[in-house]
Design a protein with these regions (language model features):
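Calycin-type beta-barrel ligand-binding domains and close structural analogs
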Residues: 53, 57, 61-69, 73-82, ...
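Bacterial N-terminal signal peptides
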Residues: 34-44
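Short, flexible coil/linker elements and helix-boundary hinge sites characteristic
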Residues: 20, 43-44, 68-69, 94-95
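Intrinsically disordered, low-complexity Ser/Thr/Pro-rich tracts
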Residues: 12, 16, 82, 86-87
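Boundary at the C-terminal end of the N-terminal hydrophobic targeting segment
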Residues: 47-51
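N-terminal secretory signal peptides that target proteins for export/translocation
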Residues: 1-27
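Short secondary-structure subsegments characteristic of cysteine-rich extracellular domains
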Residues: 87-101
Length: 318
């Protein structure tokens, strides 16, 4: 908005009747300059932003970098491969992906269920304008530089693939698929991809006996038991010397229990016991919706509860 010009004194409200030519020109220049500055400020700046839109693969890289970090396991795949008796069942692996202190760099560590490190890789992401994709360079701590892969966006997921003529470590990924809940890892070593599921961390406690309903009865609590929901187990020894455990499994069913029925995914809690000879026994299980953030079971002689957010810090609700 251009400021109004006001003249104070006895002539306030109207212009003087006599202004010399020089003064008039100077006044017009001043007014013109002021108007020009005001118009420049008020004009929309859309023209300044033209040409600043990023490439789609640059935005894709940001989403990929947000999705990658997490702890993954293919326990679901390994279990159902065995149950279905597939010719070449996948072994069970864990995969930890952590963001590095360096921008756009991630550390990916694949381990066995016993914790033995299979591979540790450094994944570095770049915008690749030539291929119109996100390039991910892979450096293995043992095998060195591996085949890079290029990420592109699909329906509700990202897919990555290496060049067909690149032949490096057969265990390094040459194809990857990344979604909200899963990461699939394909390599030359295996005909089928390793189907990792993203895990969620839970904390549990177990009460013996399983006092419920607020009854005032003595019990012993075993708490601060940590595990994730992709087939992990946590163990404790009770005061009688029994080795007891809890297992969480967020089951993603690839098959149905029987024909004509759709078996729905579930979050399952198991109560198990380990004996001196190494054998185990399942005492019972309970299940709920797969997206649930807490689950419990009461066997009367034992009560167990697992949760992502403790009731000590959760927000009270009506």
């Amino acid at each position: 908005m251009t400021p109004a010009i006001t003249i104070s004194g006895p002539t306030q409200g109207y212009w003087p009747t006599l202004i010399t030519g020089t003064r008039a020109k100077r006044s017009r220049r001043i007014v013109g300059t002021a108007l020009g500055l005001a118009l420049t400020i008020c004009l929309p700046t859309t023209s300044w932003a033209q040409g600043q839109d990023s490439a789609t693969w640059s935005r894709d890289r940001q989403v990929i970098e947000a999705l990658l970090p997490g702890f993954y396991s293919n326990a679901n795949q390994a279990y159902f491969d065995g149950r279905r008796q597939v010719p070449q069942p996948q072994n069970r692996y864990n995969l930890s992906i952590e963001a590095s202190a360096e921008p756009h760099v991630f550390n990916a560590t694949r381990t066995s269920t016993e914790g033995a490190v299979i591979s540790t890789q450094r994944w570095s992401l770049f915008d690749d304008d030539a291929k119109e994709a996100v390039r991910m360079e892979i450096d293995d701590t043992q095998a060195g530089s591996q085949c890079p892969v290029w990420w592109t966006r699909d329906a509700a997921q990202f897919s990555a693939a290496a060049d067909a003529d690149c032949a490096e470590d057969p265990g390094s990924p040459i194809t990857l698929s990344l979604a909200q809940q899963q990461l699939w890892w394909g390599s030359r070593r295996n005909d089928s991809a390793i189907k990792f599921h993203r895990s969620r961390a839970f904390t549990c406690y177990a009460d013996i006996p399983g006092v419920g309903g607020g009854r005032d009865e003595p019990y012993t609590r075993y708490d601060n038991l940590s595990l994730h929901d992709q087939g992990a187990e946590t163990w404790f020894t009770d005061k009688d010397g029994r080795t007891l455990g809890l297992r969480l499994f967020n089951v993603d069913w690839p098959i149905n229990n029987y024909e004509g029925y759709f078996t729905r995914d579930s979050l399952v809690i198991y109560v198990v016991e380990k004996f001196d000879d190494g054998t185990t026994k399942e005492h019972g299980y309970a299940f709920t919706l797969p997206e649930a953030n807490r689950i419990g079971i009461n066997l009367k002689w034992l009560l167990a509860s697992c949760f992502m957010v403790s009731g000590k810090v959760d927000t009270p609700t009506l």
